[in-house]
Amino acid sequence: MKKTLSIIMALCMVLSVCFFSVSAAEAKVGAVAADYKPEGTAITDAAGFAAMAADGIYYLANDITLDATWNAGVAVSSTYKENNAFTGTLDGNGKTITTSAPLFANLQGTVKNLTIAGAIDGGGLNCGVVTMWTKGTLTVENVLNKATIVNGNTTGGILGYGATGTVATFKNCQNDADLIAASQIGGIAGYIQDDVVVIENCVNNGNLRTDNYGAGIIGRFGRDAGALPDSVATITGCVNNGTVSSAKGQSAGIIAYLVGGAQIIDCVNNGTIVNDTATSAGILGSTRDPDKKKISGVLIKDCFNYAPVNGVTYVGGICGYLGRDANSHDGWNFRMENCGNFGDVTATGSGTMYVGGVSAYGWGGNVGSNGLANGLLNCFNAGNIKVDNSGDDSVKAYVSGVIGYFNTTVYTLENCFNAGTITTNKTTYATLIGWNNRGEGAEGVTADYCKNNYSVASGDIPVFYNGPVSESVGCTVATADQFASGEVAYLINEAAGATIYYQAIGTDKAPTLIAAEDGSNVVEKKADGSFANPAKEVPEDTKPADPVPTGDSALIFAIVAIISVLGIATVAKRKEN
């Protein structure tokens, strides 16, 4: 019997592995379906790749190896920006290119369904594995990069540098390679000056190191001088899993530096973020608008950070510096909705600091051209915050569980909470929820903007600063037990008149914005005043129709059921194909 049992269990394991391996292969970035039929002219080797016409349509018939960039016969050098562009389509057809050079110097066409491997020395030039540079329309879809880059200037796993006039789209792309650069760096794109960029469902798994701006998805979007007023970056469903470290500038999980409007939605950072001298954040490092173009603003929604964030000046779990440069802020707005930070936030240095569990610094206007007021709605911090400032007594360190500092006349700070501890050696400018420098008494500002917010206590740190006085309007201090019991989640939801926060009582130490599919983490108040999740409904008739198998018969019954399910799934899959 033992031998029979071993054979049956081994068979089940083999079948399970095969089944899940097929599922994983179907979802692999760069791959195509078995019945996929590419269009165009077949490429079978490096010579065929080099001979491609600039506007042709091509596909790979097999894996190939390259040691040179396609450049229409023009040498790749510091003048590559003026090289003939490839405006056609290259379909990888699920195949792999192994290369020691970027595929293109100037791509203004489409690359899709491709895996790229190898190692590239950027030679101090702007460098991207798919293309070094672009100006025009660029589309990259379903591309996986495994090729490392060292010695690059502006560098990206897919695109290095996009000049003014670029309209770039990246969908379902992934970078698995480590990248090292001297300037802007991103797992997908290094720097796009403007006009429009759309990045959807892209992932960075590589570790990135730069001397300047660095982020898991795109290092920088928008230019400081002459920024176009309608430049917009839309980044949705993207994830960074790699460590991002910068010597200066800004570091972030999704985008490091932004000059222009942006919507950053449903993005996640899981990689440690480090900046040696300046700004760090889990999602967005810094926004600016030096030319006062009154760009529409920035919306960060449904984004989460799960990793440590370490920096010096502006350090935030979700965002570092969110706003324009000094003066003339009216009409430009920043807003965060439904965002949460779980990572520890640490600032170390000797100069002025702005540190926040959600956002370090916010500076905007009244109501943006998108009709939304500035502020944070339904945002939280569950990470611990630490500030170590070695400056003298004149140095200010603004630190808070939600937003370190903001300066605006119309602001929403609503349904937010801080469940992390705050440790700082400078407490003068520390608050549990936030510090508003404009505050009550300034034109257009009332206490109504700040409401229904909660925080755990951290020593004698006041809950909130509103203008000339420190006060607790709209903010309540709660104990760790009140957070863990579900009470805070319930109270916020009750006051908001909607179910915003969820919590698995007994498991989650604080509320979350993520609902369980079965509704099991909804928080309810019981008759005795305690809080609990909904009781699981038990069907009235739980008696089985037939006797429950036991012993060896139960084992055999289970094995047969598994094999039957796998067989049905296989047949169904064949019919679909």
What residue spans do the PLM features occupy?
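Sec-dependent signal peptide cleavage junction
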Residues: 15-31, 546-554, 572
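A cross-kingdom C-terminal cell-surface attachment/processing module
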Residues: 554-574
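Short, aromatic-rich amphipathic segments at membrane interfaces
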Residues: 533-552
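Predominantly extracellular beta-rich ligand-binding scaffolds that present long acidic/polar faces
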Residues: 25-539
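Short, hydrophobic alpha-helical membrane anchors of single-pass surface/secreted proteins
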Residues: 4-7, 549-561
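Sec-dependent, cleavable N-terminal signal peptides
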Residues: 1-27, 567, 576-577
